[in-house]
């Protein structure tokens, strides 16, 4: 296939030229197709664990992207892999194969084996690279997490216990030695020449930072999961201090590419902000929406018990995590507002609270109502079936979805909005399709004809009917493809797809939520375009994407996606000489 690409920045809003052909309506279908539309950076994810080896003895493989969602028969073609990298082999405080001994241990039990605190070896780093290269070769992007206790062995929640045991991070003060002797570690510094000021976690982050940069194109977001069991940022000595969050988040801000965000939680971010900037934010003195491009705006939210509700309405502690570091107060509405204000990624996994018949939080209509407000972007395909079966059993009708409900955390009666596009579908199909962004072309006007030396113009409207935003910057290019032939011509615009923001009302009739998409492009930017009839396409992908068509954003319209181009047809034009 012949491809001629000229990467020139083209004004998306300023029109040039003296004699312009008139704009004419394009004969396209501007309605939404209510089906699974696979796109990067949003939707259900496939979880996968990788244990970093000390020596090269294993080859990482990637999980299948397509699956049925747990507890349902709803199919999804996922475009996110949650890559949980376990660093347990590189911490002397990380049990390798079981819980530390305690009153729960059977008679004659032996203690577990432990890792060894040391730098990440070349084999370990190459293993991460190989896993991310497998991902790059697929159609997916990654949520990347590194932790020291992926199996949660330093927290006993088995057999009726609910007890943190000891720190899992290398060098942490209350690790294995403290657990066995009561004596804390004197220092957590790594002692590596040239890095004497770094503790072991910071040093490992420094090592991994090089890998982050190499695979920036396929990393959706990095989860700040280095503290505590399961990497859930609780229970560890480090996670119990504002200073711990301060040095960790600063390290992540430094080592994660500037174009990528970091998932933590509201309490930890406000604790970091209070130390870094001398503020006094809390759930009753909420941190305001940070300015785009600032360090504070790079933080999204990971919820490990999404929509659980539960005691204190904290989602099992996920929404309130870190509240003791910022004044000891908590409010569910404030937590959700903080998430919304961050204009970033929000998601995680549900839990077994679906088995609680009186709990409205993991049920419709509360689930989509809160998801739209907090701008939910991603959830786990595998966990938990107990919650997901309720979503699949819910029939999405106007009567069902608009039934008033009153969450007990504030006693305010709410009503969700009915979108007739999904009438008769089930709740899981609605959640599958609405998570993150979902773009529908609503209007299209293009130049009827354009001279080879003229200016191609387009004016249209796009509606983001999803819950969430386009968070990561994308290139938006215009392609011209002859109606007969396989070549195409491309020009890069300066359109910012992140401006296509969602609205709480996603219905097509809400024209105030339709966002402008306009461009005016000198034909010379495409190169030497022969006269003829052309289709106009919009291609949206990551600026550092290395493939021709992978990970391009697909609109949810009928009959406009071209898989060979990885682009959406938005009209046609006649090029004249």
Task: Write out the residue ranges for each language-model feature.
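Bacterial Sec-dependent N-terminal signal peptides
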Residues: 7-8, 14-30
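An active-site-proximal structural segment forming one wall of the substrate-binding cleft
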Residues: 123-141, 164-221, 244-255
